[in-house]
């Protein structure tokens, strides 16, 4: 039976059980260039079309995998060095806008790719301040995708981070705590308020998905891991990174090598956090996943393999999250080990096809 407050019956893992597993914070014995790839493990590999990833196959063949399961929020907050709990002195929570699509037996919750403008976020937060005025809740956008809620007193409900609830579910997630009913009531009332809002009427007229739900949450991973000295990422969470240098994600590994040189940062002290596969997972779209992965094979995995074989890098790692998450470490010139059997990536970094 699922732990109270978390959901079950979904093809996606229930991250509630990972709360009881200590997250393995990787300590770097030596600096190593890292590709953080959340969402790399597809939950149902048998759904995937044929994947053409020759460079990733080589990395898988000559690399060494070490398992380290991690819920999406733990992975993101740890490796990007996300810090939010210093933003307010008073009690607070967060609100993440969603597009929710209900099916006959499941619900799809999408938070990425909604292209919310700053103006839309401001208008909606202003309206919510009036709508939730009796509770004393004050909404304000930290970014178009993440809003803060200042509370008159600490919340007597707890709900998981947005990163742990997006995707497809047979049962909608719920909060826990003495006032979980207040949380559910507000979630429902806000959803009804959003339904007829002019912002959504305009979005639908423009062919964009409506913002028809809001996820209220307050649970954050407790992480003190030091992020890399230089990170490249387009994730909205990168705005809250403690890394001293955060740049936009490059189009290719050679572009990133040039950026690291311009920043006077050795590339082994840098990392790329590429989260485009998360949106494919949210949508449950294996074809978008396959297309993105095959682009990465040309833009990142092939140049990485060549850099390792030419000894331009002493080593590199690929890390991903999830129930079967972990680290694949590849050493320089490892391709000489010709006796290692060929491997084919089929949706899991550990190389297991189930």
Which residue ranges define each predicted feature?
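…; additionally, a secondary subgroup of soluble metalloenzymes is captured
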Residues: 7, 13-354
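Extreme N-terminal basic, low-complexity initiation segments
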Residues: 2-8
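Accessible peptide chain termini
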Residues: 1-2, 32
């Amino acid at each position: 039976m699922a732990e109270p407050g978390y959901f079950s019956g979904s093809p996606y893992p229930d991250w509630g059980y990972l709360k009881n597993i200590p997250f393995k914070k990787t300590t770097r014995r030596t600096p190593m260039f890292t590709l953080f790839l959340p969402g790399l493990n597809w939950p149902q590999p048998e759904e995937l079309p044929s994947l053409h990833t020759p460079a990733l196959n080589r990395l898988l063949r000559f690399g060494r995998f070490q398992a380290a399961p991690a819920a999406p929020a733990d992975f993101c907050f740890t490796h990007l060095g996300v810090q939010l709990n210093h933003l307010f002195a008073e009690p607070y929570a967060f609100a993440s806008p969603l597009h929710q699509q209900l099916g006959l037996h499941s619900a799809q919750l999408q938070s990425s790719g909604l292209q919310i403008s700053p103006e839309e976020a401001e208008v909606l937060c202003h309206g919510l301040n009036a709508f939730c005025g009796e509770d004393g809740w004050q909404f304000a956008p930290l970014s178009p995708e993440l809003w803060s809620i200042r509370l008159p007193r600490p919340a007597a409900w707890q709900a998981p981070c947005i990163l742990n609830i997006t995707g497809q579910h047979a049962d909608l997630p719920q909060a826990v705590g003495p006032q979980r009913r207040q949380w559910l009531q507000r979630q429902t009332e806000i959803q009804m308020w959003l339904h007829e809002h002019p912002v959504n009427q305009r979005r639908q007229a423009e062919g964009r998905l409506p913002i028809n739900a809001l996820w209220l949450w307050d649970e954050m991973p407790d992480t003190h891991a030091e992020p890399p000295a230089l990170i490249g990422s387009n994730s909205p969470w990168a705005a809250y990174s403690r890394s001293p240098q955060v740049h936009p994600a490059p189009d290719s590994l050679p572009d990133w090598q040039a950026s690291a040189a311009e920043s006077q940062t050795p590339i082994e002290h840098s990392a790329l956090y590429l989260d485009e596969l998360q949106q494919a997972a949210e949508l449950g779209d294996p074809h978008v996943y396959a297309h993105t992965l095959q682009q990465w094979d040309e833009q990142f995995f092939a140049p990485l393999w060549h850099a390792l074989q030419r000894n331009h890098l002493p080593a590199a790692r690929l890390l991903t999250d999830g129930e079967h998450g972990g680290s694949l470490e590849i050493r320089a010139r490892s391709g000489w080990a010709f006796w290692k059997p060929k491997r084919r990536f089929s949706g899991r970094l550990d190389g297991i096809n189930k």
